């Protein structure tokens, strides 16, 4: 792959983004590969949305949905409530504006600690700023895949769980929090169509975490 694009439909864990950029450099030193991140991608840091998801999951007792506790669901909830911080906002808003966004987040999820979030954001932002300056990471417009940068190139999109665990086609509530069907993927990437769609299926259905499985044998 010449480049990696994280679309607006993604939740970006800042610590993981830094780590993965370092791993690319480790395995491919002096590479010209770059991680492009959509400005509308949602920001997550360790101890924020994953903490929220952990609290919610544990409160369910024996009725846990099988969450991976990465904070994806609460991050999308934050986006719907317009309290989430995007990658573009992280580098365009003033410190006072970011402070206000975090205050709004802590109003929705009162068990979060504002100062810890601000400290985590500041630390991760400084590290990512260095990667931006080196060209290892670029924050781009959400319609990046339709720009001249990728014109004439092949685009491979990872669909992950697809319909079986999707927000609309999955076995609610034991499903993921995004629409990972073909239509949802194209929408998140702002692409009008797919030229070729390849479906891959296992002989035995598997899933991450616990929860109901429609093909599970009990005997």
Give the location of each predicted region.
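Non-transmembrane, aqueous-exposed alpha-helical and coiled segments at domain scale
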Residues: 1-219
């Amino acid at each position: 792959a010449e480049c990696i694009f994280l679309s607006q439909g993604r939740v970006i864990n800042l610590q993981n983004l830094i780590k993965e950029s370092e791993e690319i450099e480790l395995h491919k030193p002096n590479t010209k590969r770059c991680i492009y991140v959509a400005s509308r991608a949602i920001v997550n840091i360790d101890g924020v949305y994953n903490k929220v998801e952990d609290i919610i999951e544990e409160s369910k007792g024996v009725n846990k949905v099988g969450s991976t506790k990465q904070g994806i669901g609460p991050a999308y909830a934050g986006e719907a409530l317009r309290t989430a911080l995007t990658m573009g906002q992280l580098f365009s808003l003033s410190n006072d504006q970011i402070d206000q966004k975090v205050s709004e987040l802590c109003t929705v999820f009162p068990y979060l600690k504002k100062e810890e979030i601000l400290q985590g954001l500041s630390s991760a932002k400084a590290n990512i700023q260095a990667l931006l300056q080196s060209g290892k990471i670029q924050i781009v417009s959400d319609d990046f895949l339709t720009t001249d940068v990728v014109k004439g190139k092949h685009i491979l999109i990872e669909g992950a769980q697809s319909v079986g665990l999707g927000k609309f086609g999955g076995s609610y509530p034991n499903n993921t929090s995004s629409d990972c069907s073909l239509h949802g993927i194209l929408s998140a990437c702002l692409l009008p169509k797919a030229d070729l769609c390849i479906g891959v299926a296992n002989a035995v259905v598997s899933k991450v975490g616990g929860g109901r499985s429609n093909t599970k044998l009990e005997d």
